[in-house]
């Protein structure tokens, strides 16, 4: 199968200088390496164009208008030629064989994606319900296991299924939780996601997202976490629990009302991606009780 590696970037020149060449060298299985640039204002494109002289399989998709992480990724996946797509943040440093060690899983047609092991960081792969929300905790770190979601910055996925399921939902703009949401849609549609401990990458957590004010990042995380519940959960009892705990959070801190209103406003902007419903909410949760 042909493989495309997509590295998303926005004003990440320093990160590209540190890690892009390592991505190219440690991705010999890839037929193309795509730099998906989201209208950077620094010299990212100048640097990558110079690097293209050395690596013929390095390509550029450059947006003239900033679109946000989800749209940038979706557009690059549509234009990629590979049957398998490797998604990497610009601050990912992959180890040797990180792609190779994941490929055998795709012999199973039910498996549509595999998450990489981020060295030094927990794989928050197990899904459960608590306090009115979908929550996640680490899975086993030494063996392959199912994963509730795949990180949008360190995973490999079947291109056709990524597009079939609607890619990353724009409702989560500008970022956060779009990959978690995609994972929920994949499981609901009857597909399987895995986490592979031998596919090792180092996530340096130097992303350009960190340039945003901390207060704004917390707000977006809270809003999008709520959206992920309202967008995906259909069980009436679980939704009732969410309403009860949301009310309790409002009583303990009125700022949460702003988050609820913002979430509903965002939901009205974007239609829900259409996908099949092979599994119920409780069916999915039961898978992760084992």
For each feature predicted by the language model, list its residue ranges.
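Short, flexible, basic/aromatic active-site loop/helix in glycosyltransferases
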Residues: 116, 129-148
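Non-catalytic, C-terminal membrane-associated alpha-helical segments of glycosyltransferases
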Residues: 234-290
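A conserved acidic beta->alpha catalytic loop
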Residues: 22, 37-46, 65
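Short, acidic, metal-binding catalytic loop of nucleotide-sugar glycosyltransferases
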Residues: 22-30
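Glycine-rich, basic loop-to-helix element that forms the pyrophosphate-binding segment
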Residues: 62-80
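Conserved donor NDP-sugar-binding/catalytic core segment of glycosyltransferases
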Residues: 92-128
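Short aromatic/hydrophobic "clamp" motif used to bind/position activated sugar donors
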Residues: 85
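A short, conserved alpha-helix in the catalytic core of glycosyltransferases
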Residues: 148-166, 171-200
């Amino acid at each position: 199968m042909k493989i495309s590696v997509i590295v998303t970037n926005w004003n990440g020149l320093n990160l590209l200088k540190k890690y892009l060449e390592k991505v190219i060298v440690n991705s010999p299985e890839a037929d193309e390496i795509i730099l998906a640039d989201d209208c950077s204002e620094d010299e990212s494109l100048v640097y990558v164009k110079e690097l293209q002289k050395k690596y013929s399989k390095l390509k550029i998709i450059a947006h003239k208008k900033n679109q946000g992480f989800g749209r940038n990724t979706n557009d690059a996946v549509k234009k990629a030629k590979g049957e398998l797509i490797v998604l990497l943040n610009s601050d990912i440093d992959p180890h040797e064989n990180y792609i190779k060690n994941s490929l055998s899983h795709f012999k199973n047609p039910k498996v549509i994606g595999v998450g990489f092991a981020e060295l030094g960081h927990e794989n928050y792969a197990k899904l459960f319900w608590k306090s009115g929300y979908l929550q996640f905790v680490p899975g086993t770190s030494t063996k392959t296991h199912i994963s509730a979601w795949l990180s949008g910055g360190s995973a490999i996925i079947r291109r056709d299924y990524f597009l079939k399921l609607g890619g990353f939902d724009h409702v989560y703009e500008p970022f956060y939780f779009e990959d978690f949401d995609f994972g929920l849609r994949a499981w609901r549609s009857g597909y399987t996601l895995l986490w592979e401990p031998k596919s090792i990458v180092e996530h340096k957590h130097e992303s350009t997202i960190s340039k945003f004010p901390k207060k704004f990042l917390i707000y977006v995380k809270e809003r999008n976490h709520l959206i992920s519940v309202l967008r995906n959960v259909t069980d009436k009892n679980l939704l009732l629990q969410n309403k009860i705990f949301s009310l309790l959070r409002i009583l303990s801190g009125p700022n949460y009302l702003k988050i609820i209103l913002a979430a509903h406003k965002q939901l009205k902007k974007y239609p829900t991606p259409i996908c099949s419903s092979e599994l119920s909410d409780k069916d999915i949760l039961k898978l992760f009780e084992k």
